[in-house]
Amino acid sequence: MKCSLRVWFLSVAFLLVFIMSLLFTYSHHSMATLPYLDSGALDGTHRVKLVPGYAGLQRLSKERLSGKSCACRRCMGDAGASDWFDSHFDGNISPVWTRENMDLPPDVQRWWMMLQPQFKSHNTNEVLEKLFQIVPGENPYRFRDPHQCRRCAVVGNSGNLRGSGYGQDVDGHNFIMRMNQAPTVGFEQDVGSRTTHHFMYPESAKNLPANVSFVLVPFKVLDLLWIASALSTGQIRFTYAPVKSFLRVDKEKVQIYNPAFFKYIHDRWTEHHGRYPSTGMLVLFFALHVCDEVNVYGFGADSRGNWHHYWENNRYAGEFRKTGVHDADFEAHIIDMLAKASKIEVYRGN
């Protein structure tokens, strides 16, 4: 009898331990899966959101299913928003000239060599090989993170920026691209103070801070020789005009604009209007190929129809539209088309 009672008590105790274990496990699991834990009972002030461990994977799956290439509301390079844009855009062509795409197609080589006079014959590949011993010669935009939204401001030099008050908005972008002279000191309220990329050719080049990428737009082989010289020996002082013999820029941030990309813009986008696209067009399409969102400032005439730079008053400023080198009217049309296709946002200024 005593043995039976002992067995009965042990069985009941075992059952109670088992039930308590189940209750503890269930309560712990339930708390872990609650979307919020109100910690007011602890300190009376905070409400803490608890995120399940699988939440990141779930979000990733939804993003992949959405088909978007970035985390922006609209991703510039994604197809489907505009048939016109999709028929022109080629996301496979790199805007940067590197070791990997050093060999130009024959038609590109011929076209590029005719842009400006070549006073002496040079082997382009040999020149590039030597240049890429000084600068990286790599494409820093090869890999894109679909979980990020790379917002870019393309800042032109139009007088319509004066009094615009765009400075703070411009500075809020990830990439801020400027071209040629583009001073910021004294104009910060309208054009911003930050720059991440500055596009120049030898005749417009200036020294840059260490955190800015210098993007050389080459029109001839001599331009490649010049940048190599300006970052080393300083021997070249003249092209078709005086140039800086030495250039203070971060060598690790020097990039070379790809002539094949240059011709792609001329063929597909500006459609041979003008001899070749303007620097503004080159920068804009560079941004369209490396950014997820592109906002454009300082392009076109001001509200009075004047074409001039924001840092100067020039009564002859509209004369460049008549040179035949660039077709400003057609380029303005392309910008309008890109805006209508929701690929860029244009800020017209004053």
From Swiss-Prot:
Q: Recount the PTM note.
A: The soluble form derives from the membrane form by proteolytic processing. N-glycosylated; necessary for proper exit from endoplasmic reticulum and trafficking to the Golgi apparatus.
Q: Which CDD domains match?
A: GT29_ST3GAL2 (cd23979)
Residue numbers binding substrate? 116, 157, 180, 240, 276, 280, 300, 309, 326
- The residue ranges crossing the membrane are 7-27
Tissues expressing the protein: Highly expressed in skeletal muscle and heart and to a much lesser extent in brain, placenta, liver and pancreas. Scarcely detectable in lung and kidney.
Kindly give the membrane topology term recorded for this protein: Single-pass type II membrane protein
**Where found?**
Golgi apparatus, Golgi stack membrane; Secreted
Q: Which UniProt keywords apply?
A: Disulfide bond, Glycoprotein, Glycosyltransferase, Golgi apparatus, Lipid metabolism, Membrane, Secreted, Signal-anchor, Transferase, Transmembrane, Transmembrane helix
Pfam families listed in its UniProt record? Glyco_transf_29
Q: Which residues lie on this side of the membrane: Cytoplasmic?
A: 1-6
Q: Does the keyword Membrane apply?
A: yes
Q: In which pathway does it act?
A: Protein modification; protein glycosylation; Glycolipid biosynthesis
InterPro entries recorded: Beta-gal_alpha2-3_sialyltrans, Glyco_trans_29, GT29-like_sf, Sialyl_trans
> Which residues, renumbered to this chain, are glycosylated?
211
Please name every pair of cysteines joined by a disulfide bond in this record.
70-75, 72-149, 152-291
Q: What family is it from?
A: Belongs to the glycosyltransferase 29 family.
> What does the protein in this record do?
A beta-galactoside alpha2-3 sialyltransferase primarily involved in terminal sialylation of ganglio and globo series glycolipids. Catalyzes the transfer of sialic acid (N-acetyl-neuraminic acid; Neu5Ac) from the nucleotide sugar donor CMP-Neu5Ac onto acceptor Galbeta-(1->3)-GalNAc-terminated glycoconjugates through an alpha2-3 linkage. Sialylates GM1/GM1a, GA1/asialo-GM1 and GD1b gangliosides to form GD1a, GM1b and GT1b, respectively.
Q: How does it assemble?
A: Homodimer; disulfide-linked. Homodimer formation occurs in the endoplasmic reticulum.
Protein's recorded name: CMP-N-acetylneuraminate-beta-galactosamide-alpha-2,3-sialyltransferase 2
